[in-house]
Curated annotation (Swiss-Prot):
Belongs to the LutB/YkgF family. It comes from Bacillus pumilus (strain SAFR-032). NCBIfam families: LutB/LldF family L-lactate oxidation iron-sulfur protein (TIGR00273). GO terms for molecular function: 4 iron, 4 sulfur cluster binding; metal ion binding. [4Fe-4S] cluster 2 binds at C322, C365, C368. InterPro entries: 4Fe4S_Fe-S-bd, 4Fe4S_Fe_S_CS, FTHF_cligase-like_sf, Helical_ferredxn, LUD_dom, LutB, LutB/LldF, LutB_C. This is Lactate utilization protein B.
Length: 473
């Protein structure tokens, strides 16, 4: 699965999302639950803003010295007997993983949840050479069983599905006959996955954070599946975006605390594992360890106005407060990275041809910026995207550009402005009934197709104000 989801146009995806009342109910319920948990967890910590500032400082420092820390990480992993591969593109990353699988004659592969492996289309690449790839994260496994449905959330992939829908998928695809309770369904999947773990020739994980000075990677899960992915198969491949770094364990401690509280509202998730190449005296762990460090456009973001987006720790706090995501769901974004973070990141990694609409899918309420634990100014970056799209890319709709040009001319000419402010209310009120415009024309049509527009006042404010002044004199 690549970054791009489906081939439908943006407006069509939005329309489908708005009409899917079941999905909207599931998303709304999950957002409210995660929001309350995050508030509670952050309040327990105390001085939350100070922790956010510290998280921002760590991420900014790491990005400012990223080349040094990447070199240190590579040296640390190699010194411990691991293998490091720097992939400039997603094709290079997938090809390397294919090469390792073929070299090790791996046919059965288990993996934990990883957005970057989705980004590089790793599953498809491995399936092309005859490998069976099984998702071990429960949410990802549900989607894989459901005809490879794409994820709609970066932390909870199946957030858009109800338990009734999940039970139906298991019944149709796996012959499941038990109840729709989470306990029964989880127990059913656990039994299947245990066999897959024991049969696996190779395990693949993502990487929440890599620790430069130790050559370790940190994996954060609620299910413990990543531990089994790294411990049972003889070969472990970890795939990370090049920015997912911390200098030392001290910084890791801070960011893991911020991640867990912001993602699921817990002090710590159930399983936090720090792994890497197996030591000579260690009993557990893989015989061979590979770390694939993926660029895929990230280096092009460094040193630009959009660099702060690389501070992201993939907690999804911004998604969990976004009113647009709440109403249209994750699939409407057409990217594996949905929500505010996706609206900023997707155009940078995937290009404006596919994602030019996303920066406009925002009310600019800045709730995302307030929620971000590392203080990424998401709403400001969305505005910057809009500026680039209109001024540098020249991609704004022609009708919109013409309208803004005409408005600029009118607003800068007092006579034309006076005439416009008198004429516009007269024209709009001709379309009104009982103070509401229900059938607009031109630029008003898209609005009135789905909601009424209050008719403007027949009297301009400046005229009313002048009358008021005269009455008071």
């Amino acid at each position: 699965m690549s970054m791009k989801i489906g081939a439908k146009a943006f407006k069509e995806r939005i329309g489908e999302g708005l009409e899917d009342t079941v999905m909207r109910g599931a998303v709304s319920s999950a957002q409210e639950r995660l929001y309350e948990r995050r508030l509670s967890a952050s309040e327990e910590l105390g001085n939350w803003e100070k922790w956010r500032e510290l998280g921002e400082e760590i991420r900014q420092h790491t990005l400012a010295h990223l080349d040094d820390y990447l070199y240190q990480l590579s040296e640390s992993v190699s010194a411990r007997g691991g293998h490091v591969f720097f992939a400039k593109t997603k094709e290079e990353a997938s090809a390397y993983i294919q090469h390792v699988a073929q070299k090790k004659e791996a046919k059965k592969i288990v993996k934990s949840k990883s957005m970057v492996t989705e980004e590089i289309e790793m599953n498809q690449a491995l399936e092309e050479i005859g490998c069976e790839v099984v998702e071990s994260d429960l949410g990802e496994y549900i989607l894989q069983v459901d005809d490879h449905e794409p994820p709609s959330h970066i932390v909870a992939p199946a957030l858009h599905m109800t338990k009734e829908q999940i039970r139906e998928v298991f019944h149709e695809k796996l012959g499941y006959e038990m109840s729709e309770t989470p306990e029964d369904m989880t127990s059913f999947v656990r039994a299947i996955l245990r066999e897959k773990f024991l049969e696996a020739d190779m395990g693949v994980t993502g990487c929440n954070f890599a620790v430069a000075n130790t050559g370790s990677i940190c994996l954060v899960t609620n299910e413990g599946n990543a531990d089994l992915v790294t411990a049972i198969p003889k070969t472990h491949i970890a795939v990370m975006g090049m920015e997912r770094m911390v200098p030392t364990m001290e910084e890791l401690d801070v960011l893991v605390g911020l991640l867990c509280r912001s993602a699921v509202g817990q002090k710590l998730t159930s399983y936090i594992s720090v792994v890497g190449p197996k030591g000579e005296e260690e009993v557990d762990g893989p015989e061979e360890f590979h770390l694939v460090i993926v660029d895929n456009g990230r280096s092009n973001i460094l040193g630009t106005a959009f660099q702060p987006v690389l501070q992201c720790i993939r907690c999804a706090a911004c998604i969990n407060v976004c009113p647009v995501y709440r109403h249209v769901g994750g699939h409407s974004y057409g990217s594996i990275y949905p929500g505010p973070i996706g609206a900023v990141l997707s155009p940078l990694l995937g290009g404006y041809d596919d994602y030019q609409e996303l920066p406009f899918a925002s009310s600019l309420c800045a709730a995302c910026t307030d929620a971000c634990p590392v203080k990424i100014p998401l709403h400001e970056l969305l505005i910057k995207h809009r500026q680039v799209i209109v001024e540098k890319e020249g991609r704004a709709p022609k009708a919109e550009m013409m309208a803004m040009k005409m408005f600029g001319m009118g607003a800068s000419t007092p006579g034309m402005y006076q005439f416009g402010t008198k004429a516009a209310p007269l024209l709009m009120n001709r379309m009104a009934s009982n103070g509401q415009i229900s059938k607009g024309i031109g630029p008003l049509k898209n609005w009135t197709d789905i909601r009424d527009l209050p008719a403007p006042s027949k009297e301009r404010f400046r005229d009313w104000f002048k009358k008021r002044q005269k009455e008071e004199q």
